[in-house]
Amino acid sequence: MRPTLPLLVQTDFPAIRRRALDTLQVNLGYKCNQTCLHCHVNAGPNRTEMMDADTVQLVLDLLRERRLTTLDLTGGAPELNEHFRDLVRGARALGVRVIDRCNLTILSEPGQEGLAEFLAEQGVEVTASLPCYSPANVDRQRGDGVFERSITGLLALNIVRQQVPQVRAGLARQRSR
């Protein structure tokens, strides 16, 4: 492989300087309740690779030792990891801001009852994506019924937000290329 550092040294491109590490993004596993055609980790319902309890404890240890301020949870559907709630509780007990990259449909999956309330009680920030405003486009990309279930998930989060004042909920618009 060709070394790239000499190429950077000989350019007028501004130097890239790193700041102190404050955010840790953790993929809790590849299992997901959706089958998105565009998934960059090829997650899906048949994937079984999930972070184990020992590794979750290492994450909590790292958060504590490095005094990190933000834990960004992703997957697959991170909520499908059996240690998700313990990790969230542990991080929040350390005063760490937690972001859940949620696909919204997980909120209505069997076994996930009370998830919206849990996220609210823990003060978790939910970052969710919806690739398009069109039900047909979303369902074509993510699976039948995903658009409608996503809207239902947003409504559930909105209801919880109204009941628990400290919950912050936002919707970001992403432009497609």
Model-predicted segments: where are they?
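Conserved alpha-helical substructure of the radical SAM core
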Residues: 2-75, 79-97, 102, 110
